[in-house]
């Protein structure tokens, strides 16, 4: 089972990453959320969004430039989808640009810059710009097109918009659909994705096909490198669920730390303190010798008797775990027969979310073990070797694995990423406990793979901030205090 791993585990980390790239099938179709992450991570790698917008608009132009049409009408929203439409209009050098909204409402720098260029070109008369609030303001255009050969470009709403169409978009879409029924010489092209129930003849999408694209979509490359799909960057952090300003206690996550023993009491405390920076409630379940050492009133404490957690504590632990969104398991647990019995029985009976770290990784019975999608493992290289993962059957690994190291490799059966934040200061004891608590906190309200990626990034970036301030001379507690700084920078 371990033959694949033994060949590379202690070699170059990138060698493992390349092997995983071969084993994990690349996605041909991605979700809008995944595309947004890739788009932002391309910027993280240094590719400006205004360049991607230029490439997207130019790709649409190249597809339509030879169409024989009397008129080109480009409906643009105030987001980056509209920005793509502005670029299309510039390359066409003619047509009517209908901005649904006001110039002051254009949301991004790159879209605003492209609109400014259009305004300058409009002074020459070939491009006409109209800002509208209501669909009725373009009735004259629809009337004019009833007997003309025309191309209508839909750059109204991109992949980031959900729910029912609001006005005036709904009525504009209805009018375009009605026009197509009257005049068969109307050709409708959507940019990236169709707006609502619009009956497009062609959709030109970018980089990869999206799950919401219809069969008429074609894919155009716009200069996003493969690395943007694999790197963990600020795009991942932006995808995390945002805290609702109207939420109340408990709605932003509840984490239970299960660990500690007579030998190690600091590990669960560090994990708990890291989690508390993000979620609403943190509980610690441990033996009395750990609980007695905790001097943090922020925690909810659950005490059991003995030197180690053991099978006699399973039923009580299961009852407590039901109150929480996620369990972080293993920090300071100790690796012996008692903890092994406890952990394997607990996992067999508990079906919630679990972050499995440290000693918990060592005492799992991996014979016939099911790598559930509810699990995130956070091993270092020796613990990873112990897990005995067979890369030839990686499709069975539904759990997310965070292989810690100079570069963190995060993967499961369907996903693979690499995190390059962090430095040698993170080799100190306790920093792994911080990471486990951090990932657990994110996992409370987000999906497993995103939580693992973001936890690794935040932990490493916090270390990078400390490296600038203190060199390598920082502690796990210093690391915890930097977590909010990282989140404020990137969210």
From Swiss-Prot:
It catalyses: (6S)-NADHX + ADP = AMP + phosphate + NADH + H(+); (6S)-NADPHX + ADP = AMP + phosphate + NADPH + H(+); (6R)-NADHX = (6S)-NADHX; (6R)-NADPHX = (6S)-NADPHX. Its EC number is 4.2.1.136, 5.1.99.6. Residues 232-490 form the YjeF C-terminal domain. Binds 1 potassium ion per subunit. Residues 35-230 form the YjeF N-terminal domain. (6S)-NADPHX 1 binds at residue 192. HAMAP family: NADHX_dehydratase, NADHX_epimerase. This is Bifunctional NAD(P)H-hydrate repair enzyme Nnr. It comes from Methanocaldococcus jannaschii (strain ATCC 43067 / DSM 2661 / JAL-1 / JCM 10045 / NBRC 100440) (Methanococcus jannaschii).
């Amino acid at each position: 089972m371990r033959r694949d791993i033994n060949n590379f585990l202690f070699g170059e980390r990138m060698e493992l990453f390349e092997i995983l790239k071969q084993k994990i099938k690349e996605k041909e179709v991605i979700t809008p959320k995944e595309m947004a992450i890739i788009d932002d991570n391309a910027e993280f790698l240094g590719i400006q969004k205004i360049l991607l917008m230029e490439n997207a608009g130019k790709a649409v132009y190249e597809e339509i430039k030879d169409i024989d049409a009397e008129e080109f009408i480009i409906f643009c929203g105030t987001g980056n989808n509209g920005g793509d439409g502005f670029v299309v209009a510039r390359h066409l050098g003619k047509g009517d640009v209908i901005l649904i909204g006001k110039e002051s409402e254009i949301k991004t720098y790159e879209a605003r810059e492209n609109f400014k260029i259009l305004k300058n070109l409009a002074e020459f008369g070939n491009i006409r710009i109209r800002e509208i609030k209501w669909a009725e303001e373009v009735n004259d255009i629809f009337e004019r097109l009833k007997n003309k050969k025309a191309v209508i470009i839909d750059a109204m709403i991109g992949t980031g918009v959900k729910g029912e169409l609001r006005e005036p978009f709904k009525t504009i879409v209805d009018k375009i659909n009605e026009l197509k029924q009257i005049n068969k010489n109307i050709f409708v092209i959507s940019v990236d994705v169709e707006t609502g129930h619009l009956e497009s003849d062609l959709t030109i999408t970018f980089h990869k096909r999206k799950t919401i694209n219809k069969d008429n979509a074609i894919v155009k490359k716009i200069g996003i490198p493969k690395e943007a799909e694999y790197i963990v960057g600020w795009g991942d952090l932006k995808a995390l669920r945002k805290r609702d300003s109207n939420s109340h206690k408990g709605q932003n996550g509840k984490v239970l730390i299960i660990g500690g023993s007579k030998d190690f009491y600091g590990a669960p405390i560090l994990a708990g303190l890291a989690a508390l920076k993000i979620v609403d409630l943190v509980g610690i379940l441990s033996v009395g010798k750990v609980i007695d050492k905790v001097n943090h009133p922020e925690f909810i404490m659950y005490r059991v008797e003995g030197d180690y957690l053991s099978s006699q504590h399973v039923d009580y632990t299961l009852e407590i775990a039901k109150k929480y969104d996620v369990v972080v398991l293993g920090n300071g647990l100790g690796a012996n027969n008692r903890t092994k019995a406890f952990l394997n029985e607990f996992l067999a009976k508990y079906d919630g979310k679990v972050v499995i770290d440290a000693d918990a990784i060592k005492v799992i019975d991996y014979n016939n073990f099911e790598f559930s999608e509810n699990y995130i493992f956070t091993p270092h290289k020796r613990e990873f070797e112990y897990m005995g993962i067979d890369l030839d059957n990686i499709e069975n690994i539904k759990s997310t694995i965070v292989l810690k190291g100079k570069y963190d490799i995060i993967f499961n059966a369907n996903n693979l990423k690499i995190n390059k934040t962090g430095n040698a200061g993170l080799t100190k004891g306790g920093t792994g406990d911080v990471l486990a608590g951090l990932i657990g906190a994110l996992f409370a309200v987000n999906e497993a793979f995103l939580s693992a990626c973001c936890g690794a990034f935040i932990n490493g970036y916090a270390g990078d901030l400390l490296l600038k301030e203190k060199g390598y001379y920082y502690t796990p507690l210093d690391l915890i205090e930097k977590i909010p700084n990282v989140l404020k920078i990137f969210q």
